[in-house]
């Protein structure tokens, strides 16, 4: 996780020292934490950055914050599967190969023979030889699907976008 992010929003900066001022600000924060408070935007970005740690997605973790015009936080979201579904970081190869639980895996994953054959071919040796030494191995549906189809498309993710999740929080809780 990055702790420092410098951004120069000015394209035609006449103020020569804008970036220098930001560097001084962060050095001050390092040497004397709490002396300089973060800007409203920095505070919201830090919240979004921390929110992404809740993501159940293996391939991409994203956080989002919705604020009003005064930067008062109204909702926080992160990319994860829809309510009631099991996130990819909790779905394991062992469970897929040995169980194929309908509550955990999609109808496509359970019934599509091409997908099932790919999973057995790719992971059966790993499971049978106990290469993982008892550790669990999660898998990303999108990555496996892209490998089968040869597509580079990101469309086949199971996760809701972080922004979508934040908007759903507003709708659900006000």
Each model region followed by its residue ranges:
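Zinc-dependent deaminase catalytic domain
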Residues: 13-174
């Amino acid at each position: 996780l990055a702790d420092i992010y410098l951004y120069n929003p000015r394209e035609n900066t006449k103020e020569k020292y804008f970036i220098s001022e930001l560097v001084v600000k962060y050095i001050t924060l390092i040497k004397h934490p709490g002396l300089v408070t973060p800007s409203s935007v920095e505070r919201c970005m830090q919240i979004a950055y921390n929110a992404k740690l809740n993501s159940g997605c293996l391939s991409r973790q994203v956080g989002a914050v919705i604020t009003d015009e005064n930067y008062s936080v109204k909702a926080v979201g992160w990319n994860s599967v829809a309510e009631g579904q099991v996130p990819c970081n909790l779905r394991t190869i062992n469970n897929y190969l040995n169980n194929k639980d309908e509550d955990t895996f999609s109808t496509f994953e359970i019934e599509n023979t091409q997908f099932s054959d790919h999973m057995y071919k790719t992971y059966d040796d790993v499971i049978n030889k106990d290469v993982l030494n008892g550790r669990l191995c999660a898998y990303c549906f999108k990555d496996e699907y892209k490998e089968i189809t040869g597509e580079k498309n990101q469309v086949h993710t199971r996760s809701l976008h972080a922004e979508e999740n934040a908007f759903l929080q507003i709708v659900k809780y006000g």
